[in-house]
UniProtKB/Swiss-Prot annotation:
InterPro entries: 2Fe-2S_ferredoxin-like_sf, 2Fe-2S_ferredoxin-type, Mopterin_OxRdtase, Mopterin_OxRdtase_4Fe-4S_dom, NADH_UbQ_OxRdtase_75kDa_su_CS, NADH_UbQ_OxRdtase_ferredoxin, NADH_UbQ_OxRdtase_Gsu, NADH_UbQ_OxRdtase_Gsu_4Fe4S-bd
Residues involved in [4Fe-4S] cluster 1 binding: 160, 164, 167, 173
Function: Core subunit of the mitochondrial membrane respiratory chain NADH dehydrogenase (Complex I) that is believed to belong to the minimal assembly required for catalysis. Complex I functions in the transfer of electrons from NADH to the respiratory chain. The immediate electron acceptor for the enzyme is believed to be ubiquinone. This is the largest subunit of complex I and it is a component of the iron-sulfur (IP) fragment of the enzyme. It may form part of the active site crevice where NADH is oxidized.
UniProt xrefs under Gene3D superfamilies: 3.10.20.740, 3.30.70.20, 3.40.50.740, Dimethylsulfoxide Reductase, domain 2
Reaction(s) catalysed by this chain's protein: a ubiquinone + NADH + 5 H(+)(in) = a ubiquinol + NAD(+) + 4 H(+)(out)
Cofactor annotation: [2Fe-2S] cluster; [4Fe-4S] cluster
GO cellular component, one term: mitochondrial inner membrane
First and last residues of the transit peptide: 1-27
Domain 4Fe-4S His(Cys)3-ligated-type intervals: 144-183
Higher taxonomy: Eukaryota, Viridiplantae, Streptophyta, Embryophyta, Tracheophyta
Source species of the chain: Solanum tuberosum
Protein name: NADH dehydrogenase [ubiquinone] iron-sulfur protein 1, mitochondrial
Cellular compartments annotated: Mitochondrion inner membrane
Binding site for [2Fe-2S] cluster: 100, 111, 114, 128
Length: 738
């Protein structure tokens, strides 16, 4: 009975298709764009209401000769040649259902959910894989298209389990939404559903492979974006499944993005499993501060707790991807937090005190110390407002010894072009040759590395690397381990010199680890010579870049956080650590008084005499500037912990107690102060390029040493106080060392 019903429905469907189709358009008609467009325009309805592109779809028409016109449900649409039918529909404001198609991945065309009707085509076509042709008439809402999608959805649901009540994808599942919109209200499949063994991809991605619909998004992402060939399609027919050929973990710093691109609940977040539903969460737009890229994120919270972090679209910085560290560090926000002001007693133990008492002790000690013996250090996660306040406080106390950890004692702070990415992150896609000097972008700035990988994959750009042995996910030449290689390239004696010379848009990226070298000036002089000899810096192109490591470095240099003496730590008697946990205090005198202002009980606490609890970046509003010189703002997603306060408010209160009150008591006032020092920091979400070239840098007589470059980041998953407190990051770190 079931087979008879199925056969009769198939016959009726084929009869409908035969009766509704016409003869296939001939090749000459397709080639004559003007005739096709004119014929289609004659049939187009007039006075159509205006439509808007779907999902932020954008169309750029630089050359009128490369433009064709198609008709989507009667609406004329101008699109560039080479676009697919699906892209034309998006520009026309029509949302086409899809599972396998993703705008940043190659076209697979295997889910068939995007079927539409094209006039004079004998059957529905897969719009994601069909090129749009001049004058093409596309119909997206006809009975044939609806019937085709309903049939495809029925096939997809045949083996899909009824897990929605216990599936973490519930509420934000493409299969749920599209089955509701395009599926039937009943199914005819009565056989046993298949089941698939789950795969172990590591501590971050949870797999329930029985839910998989074989869209291959994860496979294509791993290969094309992450640059690892860990996933693939195995078997065929009903035995087809996605997994690893040999049992192994997914070894990529971008692996968590498969959670976002999976249209069903096959790949979900393992730390977030069974924690909350998406409609229970409050989303707050913010940025990531665990590296210097400033990836755009959305912080999802419930009550006082951050539940998860997901990416936010920004074409110029992170596109729609984020690193695993960015996505999963959040559990560190609730561990090892500092809740109350504390002072170290005579027995070496900390005891909680009031804010008034803590600030009074700090102010009293500051007045007893000579100004030149007072040192301030801004940490990796410091915002611009707090660094401005700390600098003003120390200046009023007579000290100019303040710096940001990671910048060293002698950063290239004279010219802004000497410490930012002049090419910009998105501009890397225009490069055709890369020279990486002492930097490993894969662990220092994963999203910058993703751009380089994207460029190398698309254009076969050549990559030369000078530094210690490293694991890159794209083809590269390891040129050497020490700066002597740079001298050879500068003099044209190295084979890679020809690659830079022949490149149209060469790029040089210098790692921030060079700042800590004794021969820093000589290294940068060699890099400047390479740039000059190979036309790296031109009026229309600046390919000379410095890749910084943490979120505070660029803003600190813009604000002038440069120490007056390179021996300030050795002679200091009072050190103010504002979230600085990785600064080297080995040479600090034993009798020095140390104040630690921060949000985690990390390395800086062990040397502290007074602890002042501060807010984390998820609990305050602050300006951060990324490595390309773009200022962005974090917004508070959850309330502060315990008796903690914002960093700049603590410094402001301390100045009042010390009798040198700072002239601002609000964010607006302190930003007005910032405007007088670094106005570019107030141009939020607008990249401010450097005005002057590094060619203005003075000549140096220093010679490069034979000391090899060293890795700037030893452990990708643990780089700051928050990530070191994260249990998830600890699990990833343990697997990394195996």
């Amino acid at each position: 009975m079931g087979l008879g019903l199925l056969a009769s429905r198939a016959l009726r469907s084929s009869r409908i298709i035969r009766n509704s189709t016409r003869t296939i358009v001939s090749t000459p008609e397709l080639k004559n764009a003007d005739a096709a467009a004119a014929a289609a325009a004659a049939d187009a309805p007039s006075d159509l209401p205006k439509r808007h592109p779907v999902g932020g779809a954008r169309v750029h028409l630089p050359n009128p000769e490369d433009v064709i016109e198609v008709f989507v449900d009667g609406y004329p649409v101008k699109i560039p040649k080479g676009m697919t039918v699906l892209q034309a529909c998006e520009i026309a404001g029509v949302d086409i259902p899809r599972f396998c198609y993703h705008s940043r991945l190659s076209i697979a065309g295997n889910c068939r959910m995007c079927l539409v009707e094209v006039e004079k085509s004998p059957k529905p076509v897969a719009s994601c894989a069909m090129p749009a042709l001049p004058g093409m008439k596309i119909k997206t809402d006809t009975p044939i298209a609806k019937k085709a999608r309903e049939g495809v959805m029925e096939f997809l649901l045949m083996n899909h389990p009824l897990d929605c009540p216990i599936c973490d994808q519930g509420g934000e599942c493409d299969l749920q939404d599209q089955s509701m919109a395009f599926g039937s209200d009943r199914g005819r499949f009565t056989e046993m559903k298949r089941s698939v063994v789950d795969k172990n991809l590591g501590p971050l991605v949870k797999t329930v492979m029985t839910r998989c619909i074989q869209c291959t998004r994860c496979v294509r992402f791993a290969s094309e974006v992450a640059g690892v060939e860990d996933l693939g399609m195995l078997g065929r027919g009903s035995g087809e499944e996605i997994g690893t050929y040999v049992e192994k973990l997914m070894t990529s710093e971008l692996s968590g993005n498969v959670i976002d691109i999976c249209p069903v609940g096959a790949l979900t977040s393992k730390p977030f499993a069974f924690k909350a539903r998406n409609w229970e969460l409050k989303g707050t737009e913010s940025i990531d501060v665990t590296d210097a890229v400033g990836s755009n994120i959305r912080i999802d919270s419930r009550g006082p707790e951050v539940m998860r972090v997901v990416p936010r679209l920004n074409e110029d910085i992170n596109e729609e991807w984020i690193s695993d560290k960015t996505r999963f560090f959040y559990d560190g926000l609730k561990r090892q937090r500092l809740n109350d002001p504390m002072i170290r007693g005579a027995d070496g133990r900390f005891q909680a005190v009031s804010w008034r008492d803590a600030l009074a002790i700090v102010a009293e000690v500051m007045h007893q110390i000579k100004p030149e013996e007072i040192v301030g250090v801004a940490g990796k996660l410091s915002d611009a407002e707090s660094m401005m306040a700390l600098k003003d406080l120390l200046n009023k106390m007579g000290s100019n010894n303040i710096f940001c950890e990671g910048n060293g004692m002698h950063p290239n702070a004279d010219l802004r072009s000497g410490y930012i990415m002049n090419t910009s992150i998105s501009g890397l896609e225009k490069a055709d040759a890369f020279l990486l000097v002492g930097t490993q972008p894969r662990v220092e700035a994963a999203m910058v590395n993703a751009r380089i990988h994207k460029t190398v994959k698309a254009t076969n750009a050549k990559v030369g690397y000078v530094g210690p042995a490293a694991d890159f996910n794209y083809d590269h030449e390891h040129l050497g381990t020490d700066p002597q290689t740079l001298v050879e390239i500068a003099e044209g004696r190295h084979p890679f010199s020809s690659a830079l010379k022949n490149a149209k848009n060469p790029v040089i990226i210098v790692g921030a680890g060079v700042f800590d070298r004794d021969d820093k000036d000589a290294v940068f002089a060699a890099v400047d010579t390479i740039a000059k000899n190979n036309n790296v810096v031109r009026p229309d192109w600046n390919g000379l870049n410095v890749l910084l490591l943490n979120a505070a470095q660029v803003a600190a240099l813009d604000l002038g956080l440069v120490p007056e003496s390179d021996k300030c730590i050795e002679s200091a008697k009072f050190v103010y650590l504002m979230g600085a946990d990785d600064v080297n205090l080995d040479k600090l005198p034993d009798d020095a008084f140390v104040v630690y202002q921060g949000h985690h009980g990390d390395r800086g606490v062990y040397r502290a005499n007074v602890i002042l609890p501060a807010s984390a970046f998820t609990e305050k509003e602050g300006i951060y500037e990324n490595t390309e010189g773009c200022a962005q703002i974090t917004l508070p997603a959850v309330p502060t912990v315990g008796d903690a306060r914002d960093d700049w408010k603590i410094v402001r209160a301390l100045s009042e107690v010390a009798g040198v009150g700072l002239p601002y008591d609000s964010l607006g006032a302190i930003r007005s102060r910032i405007k007088t020092v670094a106005p570019n920091l107030l141009e939020v979400d607008e990249r401010q390029p450097a005005t002057f070239s590094t060619s203005l840098r003075p000549e140096v007589s220093q010679k490069v040493s034979a000391t090899p470059f060293t890795p700037a980041v030893e452990n990708f998953y643990m780089t700051d106080a928050i990530t070191r407190a994260s249990k998830i990051m600890a699990q990833c770190s343990a697997l990394l060392k195996k």
